[in-house]
Amino acid sequence: MSRADEIFIQNCKDILTNGTWDTDREVRPKWDDGTPAHTVKKFGVVNRYDLSKEFPILTLRRTYWKSAVDELLWIWQKKSNNVHDLRSHIWDAWADENGSIGKAYGYQVGVKHHYPQGDMDQIDKVLWDLKHNPASRRIMTNLYTFADLSEMALYPCAYSMTYNVTGNKLNAILNQRSQDMLAANNWNVVQYSVLVMMIAQVSGLVPGELVHVIADAHIYDRHVPFVEEIIQNEPRPAPKFTLDPNVDDFYKFTLDSFTMEGYQYSDFSGKIPVAE
């Protein structure tokens, strides 16, 4: 069993057994038919993934890792807020007629800020600090800009990363305000694991731990049967995920720079509804 499978099963069982339902109050999300999308949740879930040991991708069901990485590059490398720059259509529901999601995600990454070393955006400052001041305890990014929230199609769910160099390892903490466990949990874990691996490689470091801190880890009411089915599936060993070792520039990574070997997963044919 992969560590990602083990953590997912533990989280979901805990939420379903010990979680709190919000059926006693009004909620913002709705299903396609207009019905309120209620959830059962746990507060303050913390998961640790040791990237030096294995790549944390689910085998209980397939995670479309190439689409997840494409979205990662869209945000952190292209710094785009336009869905036309994405291969998938995941974000289409939140885009305007021009394909924009407003001042969200990639837009925030690309905003330049003034530092003593010069003007840099968030990811470039991380890369600069890791090269020139790896002992710093101030290496972080934050996409939750209050002044711009009114111009975002969707408030950032995974919103901040804190990077820390310990020895020759790059560790990171991902803070997430809200997590749809079925639809997006492993998607986000895969993305930010890859981001840590990319940054580590171009900074002359090796990947360490990704610590995922989730404020509100929830399962939607209509997702419960799917979750109950998936956590009963047969888990398999974690596959091997590698980056092209010749890439030494963060902006030179492409989808072809990543390889997954031996990825086996259980079949799952359910059509998962998404609340908006």
Spans of model-derived segments:
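Terminal, non-catalytic protein-protein interaction segments that mediate quaternary/complex assembly
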Residues: 1-276
